[in-house]
């Protein structure tokens, strides 16, 4: 999952 928070 892309984003500032890792999956």
UniProtKB/Swiss-Prot annotation:
Record PTM Pyrrolidone carboxylic acid, positions in chain: 1
Keyword Kinase: no
Keyword annotations from UniProtKB, A to Z: G-protein coupled acetylcholine receptor impairing toxin, G-protein coupled receptor impairing toxin, Hypotensive agent, Pyrrolidone carboxylic acid, Secreted, Toxin
Cellular component annotations (GO), alphabetically ordered: extracellular region
Subcellular compartments: Secreted
Tissue specificity remark: Expressed by the venom gland.
Any one GO BP annotation for this protein: regulation of blood pressure
Molecular functions (GO terms): toxin activity
Keyword Flavoprotein attributed: no
Coiled coil: none
Function field: This peptide shows potent and long-lasting antihypertensive activity as well as a reduction of the heart rate. These effects may be explained by the agonistic activities of this peptide for the muscarinic acetylcholine receptor M1 (CHRM1) (EC(50)=0.25-0.31 uM), since these types of G-protein coupled receptor have been demonstrated to be active in the blood pressure control.
Additional free-text comment from the UniProt record: Negative results: weakly inhibits angiotensin-converting enzyme (ACE) with no clear preference for either C- or N-domains. It does not potentiate bradykinin, and does not affect angiotensin-1 pressor effects. It does not bind to type-1 angiotensin-2 receptor (AGTR1). It does not bind to the muscarinic acetylcholine receptor M3 (CHRM3).
Protein family membership: Belongs to the bradykinin-potentiating peptide family.
Official protein name in the record: Bradykinin-potentiating peptide 7a
Organism of origin: Bothrops jararaca (Jararaca)
């Amino acid at each position: 999952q892309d984003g500032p928070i890792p999956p």
